[in-house]
Amino acid sequence: MKRRSVCVGDTVYVLAGNDKGKQGKVLRCLKDKVVVEGINVRVKNIKRSQENPKGKRINIEAPLHISNVRLSIDNQPARLFVKVREKGRELWNKHSDGSSSLYRSVRERKG
């Protein structure tokens, strides 16, 4: 499985779909999808029950595919590349002028 560059709590930029161009915070990471706060909101109908005699409608965030979001740095979508070191992986942000800067360092777990 390909490793993700997006983690819970990161701000991401939506590249495709109804919410294209919007930004939000990652709430959950699934296998190849992410749930973003306030993005891809769907309405779920709750049936009538003793707790809800009238029933109700709630809004939930549906997951987006990981390929439709990109990490947002300085309110712009960022292109990241990975360098593998002895201690673990490093995610680097590539700038438009050709330079790059370290964004995050991830230590590999054994086991």
UniProtKB/Swiss-Prot annotation:
<keyword id="KW-0687">Ribonucleoprotein</keyword>
<comment type="function">
    <text>One of the proteins that surrounds the polypeptide exit tunnel on the outside of the subunit.</text>
</comment>
<dbReference type="InterPro" id="IPR005824">
    <property type="entry name" value="KOW"/>
</dbReference>
<dbReference type="InterPro" id="IPR005825">
    <property type="entry name" value="Ribosomal_uL24_CS"/>
</dbReference>
<comment type="similarity">
    <text>Belongs to the universal ribosomal protein uL24 family.</text>
</comment>
<dbReference type="GO" id="GO:0006412">
    <property type="term" value="P:translation"/>
</dbReference>
<dbReference type="Pfam" id="PF17136">
    <property type="entry name" value="ribosomal_L24"/>
</dbReference>
<dbReference type="InterPro" id="IPR003256">
    <property type="entry name" value="Ribosomal_uL24"/>
</dbReference>
<keyword id="KW-0699">rRNA-binding</keyword>
<dbReference type="InterPro" id="IPR041988">
    <property type="entry name" value="Ribosomal_uL24_KOW"/>
</dbReference>
<dbReference type="GO" id="GO:0019843">
    <property type="term" value="F:rRNA binding"/>
</dbReference>
<dbReference type="GO" id="GO:0003735">
    <property type="term" value="F:structural constituent of ribosome"/>
</dbReference>
<protein>
    <recommendedName>
        <fullName>Large ribosomal subunit protein uL24</fullName>
    </recommendedName>
</protein>
<comment type="function">
    <text>One of two assembly initiator proteins, it binds directly to the 5'-end of the 23S rRNA, where it nucleates assembly of the 50S subunit.</text>
</comment>
<dbReference type="GO" id="GO:0005840">
    <property type="term" value="C:ribosome"/>
</dbReference>
<dbReference type="InterPro" id="IPR014722">
    <property type="entry name" value="Rib_uL2_dom2"/>
</dbReference>
<comment type="subunit">
    <text>Part of the 50S ribosomal subunit.</text>
</comment>
<keyword id="KW-0694">RNA-binding</keyword>
<dbReference type="InterPro" id="IPR008991">
    <property type="entry name" value="Translation_prot_SH3-like_sf"/>
</dbReference>
<keyword id="KW-0689">Ribosomal protein</keyword>
<dbReference type="Pfam" id="PF00467">
    <property type="entry name" value="KOW"/>
</dbReference>
<dbReference type="GO" id="GO:1990904">
    <property type="term" value="C:ribonucleoprotein complex"/>
</dbReference>
